[in-house]
A protein has these predicted regions:
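Glycine-rich beta-strand-to-loop/alpha-helix junction loops that act as flexible
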Residues: 80-84
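Residue-level detector of anion-binding/catalytic polar loops
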Residues: 75-76, 142
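N-terminal flexible segment immediately upstream of the FAD-binding catalytic core
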Residues: 1-68, 85-119, 134, 148, ...
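FAD-binding subdomain of flavoenzyme oxidoreductases
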Residues: 110-225
Length: 225
């Protein structure tokens, strides 16, 4: 029985890779063991799991299409960017029921110009904290959130974990720094906005909802920190 089962699993993975590649491009989907390995374990080595494939979208639209596909085909999704967490939240679960992919946000690393009047920028979820800092400092400002993993940790991850860091007592956590956020729900619906409005009277205030949600509610793709 092992032969047919293995063949079936290979066929499912092949079809999954083909479908994901049609969304983000073949160069940004891989299922081979060597390339997956760096995404299947956290940097401490304590938490590991196996994914069927890794997909690296370039923008919110591609994230939305990936999530819609996975939702429709019962494929689990693990969101990952800098992979600097210490509790295994960014790697596949070893006891997962069914196939899963790692959704890497590293390519969502664009940053807009600093708006001196609002003191905010538009940053992709995959932008590192260090790049956010550099942009702010060029404009004569600094970031209220800072921590040792700044060169690898990302804006999206910092929001999802509601990170604080060494300046948290003075400035608060990421929840206090973000005025706008763009995210994608599990079914591919894009929510939120990247406006500078401190309060919205229509619908949910997505920065407050998603800060600290650890990826359980939506995938953050961009923000206004």
């Amino acid at each position: 029985m092992s032969g047919p089962c293995n063949t079936s699993a290979v066929d499912r993975t092949t079809e999954l890779v083909r479908s994901l590649s049609s969304i983000v491009g073949a160069d940004h989907v891989f299922a081979d063991d060597d390339r997956r390995a760096g995404y299947e374990s956290d940097w401490t080595g304590r938490y590991t799991g196996t994914c069927a494939a890794v997909a690296r979208p370039a923008d919110t639209d591609e994230v939305a299409r990936l999530l819609e596909y996975c939702n429709n085909h019962a494929v689990g999704v693990v969101t990952q960017a800098g992979n600097t967490g210490l509790v295994g939240g960014g790697v596949p679960r070893p006891d997962a029921d069914g196939p899963a992919i790692v959704l890497s946000l590293r390519r969502l690393d664009r940053i807009g110009g600093l708006d001196a009047s609002s003191m905010h920028v538009t940053a992709g979820a995959g932008l590192t904290i260090a790049e956010w800092q550099r942009t702010a400092r060029v404009g004569g400002f600094d970031t209220p959130v800072d921590f040792a993993a700044r060169d690898s940790a990302t804006v999206g991850g910092a929001i999802a974990t509601n990170a604080g860091g060494s300046r948290v007592v003075r400035f608060g956590t990421m929840r206090q720094q973000v005025v706008g956020v763009e995210a994608v729900l599990a079914d591919g619906t894009v929510v939120g906005s990247l406006s500078d409005l401190p309060k919205e009277t229509v619908g949910l205030h997505w920065p407050s909802v998603l800060a600290g949600s650890e990826g359980t509610l939506a995938v953050i793709t961009a923000a206004r920190p």
